[in-house]
Structures are given as C-alpha cells and as structure tokens.
C-alpha cells in the first residue's frame, strides 16, 4: 500500500519530503482555486520529483470560470514530467484531456466516483426503498464493469479514488481487478 500526503502549505515541503511518504498530492477536490499559483506549483512539483516521490495533482469540479486555468495548469505540469498523476473530478476536464491526448496518468477522483453512501443522512433518504433500490443508490457510479471498462478504454484512466465504506470497498476491488491498480 502506498501512502499519500496531500499538502496545501508549500512552505513545509522540505519537511514533508523527509517523511516516509510515497506520494505527495497537491490540490483539492472541493476548491478549484487551491492550485492556481502555477509558478510556485511548478517549483514544488519539480522539487518533489527530484526527491523521488510520486506527484499527484488533484483538480476539483471545475466551473466555467476556472476551466481554462485548470487545463492550462495540467498541460504545463505535464510538460515537466509524464510521471505526474492527475486526479480529475470533472467530466469536462476529463473530456478535454482525452481530446488533447495527455500522456500522464489520469485517476478518477472522488467527485466523479461518489455514491449516496458517503452522505451522513443516506440511511434516512432510502429507508422506505426496496433492497434493490437501496443497493443502486449506495453503489458508486463506477460500480459496474461496463462503466469501468468504458472509462479505461476511452479515457485511459489508470485508477480511481474510493471511499472505504462497504460499497466503496466493493468498487475499489472491482476496479483493482479491471484496471490492475
């Protein structure tokens, strides 16, 4: 198992690089403004790669206002190294990267791979439903082989980020078998 540390305070990078961590992540699933200091991010990405760590850049759900900045950031960082992994949480960004034929590893993020199971009130929402409906609502939108195969073939996804709740664990196992991660 690999250990990832997601950071937002770049000033502490030297300290983080000393730790026994495999992956250093930059960005945030929920805040599209968290990674737009491009010159600083380029600097910390290069330093992280030089330290022998895997770099994972996390993009959020992207509004129209931030779309251009997000894809420009990915393109610029992709020029630094093809080893940088990008966690994508927006279908529009995923489609754009596919059309641009970006060679970096693309990982489906939590915002694209979510389920009702993650919400605290999910039991209350589905308590009157049949078991079949409950299972459908609780299962991730990446919870079947055909969806995983489609994204693997069309978008060349290299993996996904999953919750560790019961249904999330099932989807994680299925993806591991189909994607090999």
Where are these regions (language model features)?
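Active-site pocket-lining/capping segments in soluble small-molecule metabolic enzymes
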Residues: 1-44, 53, 58-181
